[in-house]
C-alpha cells in the first residue's frame, strides 16, 4: 500500500489537544540564531532538532546547537525553549548559570537533519517511496511534533535556501505512514 500524499494538512489530521497551532518546516529553522533574552544575546545556531519517537507523532525533546569552529555543541532541553520567532529562537539561560550540557544521543531519539533530511523512507509495506526533502512540524502549546515529511521539489528547493521559488504543490506524507530506512547511522 503506497502512503497517501496530502496537499495540505487537515484539522482532523492533527493530534488531539493542539488548540492554537502553527506549521513550520525544518528547513526554515535550521541555522536560525539561538538567543538568551534579547536578540543581541546570541549563543549559537540551531543545527538539529531532537525528537522522541513517541506514537503517533514524534515529540521534540530538545535542540542541538553549535557555537562555531572548535567549540563544543550543546543540547538545550525543549522545556527551556521559550519561543520561536521569524528571526531567532529564544531560550532560557542554562540552569546552572554556565553552559548547557553536551549532546548525548539516547535510544528512541531521532535527529531531523541527521536521520531524516535527504534520506529514503519506506511505505507501510516496506517498499521504497521517496527521499525526504523537508520535514513539516507542528508547534502548539509549548510542544513541537513531526507531522509530515515533504517529498516534493518545493521541499528540495526550501532545503537549499530557494524557498521563494514554487514549482508545484508540496507533497506531504503523514508521519503515520513514514518509516525511516535507518536511524542507527
Predicted regions and their residues:
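Peripheral interaction segments used for macromolecular assembly
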Residues: 1-185
Amino acid at each position: 500500500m503506497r502512503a497517501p500524499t496530502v496537499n495540505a494538512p487537515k484539522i482532523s489530521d492533527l493530534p488531539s489537544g493542539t488548540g492554537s497551532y502553527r506549521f513550520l518546516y525544518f528547513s526554515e529553522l535550521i541555522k536560525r540564531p539561538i538567543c538568551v533574552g534579547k536578540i543581541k544575546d546570541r549563543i549559537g545556531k540551531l543545527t538539529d532538532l531532537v525528537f522522541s519517537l513517541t506514537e503517533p507523532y514524534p515529540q521534540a525533546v530538545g535542540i542541538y546547537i553549535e557555537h562555531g569552529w572548535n567549540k563544543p555543541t550543546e543540547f538545550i532541553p525543549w522545556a527551556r525553549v521559550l519561543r520561536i520567532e521569524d528571526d531567532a529562537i529564544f531560550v532560557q539561560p542554562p540552569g546552572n548559570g554556565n553552559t548547557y550540557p553536551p549532546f548525548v544521543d539516547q535510544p528512541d531519539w531521532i535527529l531531523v537533519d541527521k536521520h531524516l533530511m535527504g534520506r529514503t523512507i519506506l511505505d507501510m509495506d516496506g517498499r521504497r517511496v521517496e527521499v525526504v526533502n523537508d520535514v513539516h512540524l507542528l508547534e502548539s502549546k509549548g510542544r513541537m511534533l513531526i507531522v509530515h515529511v515533504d517529498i516534493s521539489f518545493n521541499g528540495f528547493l526550501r532545503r537549499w535556501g530557494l524557498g521563494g521559488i514554487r514549482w508545484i504543490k508540496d507533497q506531504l506524507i503523514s508521519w503515520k505512514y513514514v518509516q525511516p530506512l535507518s536511524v542507527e547511522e
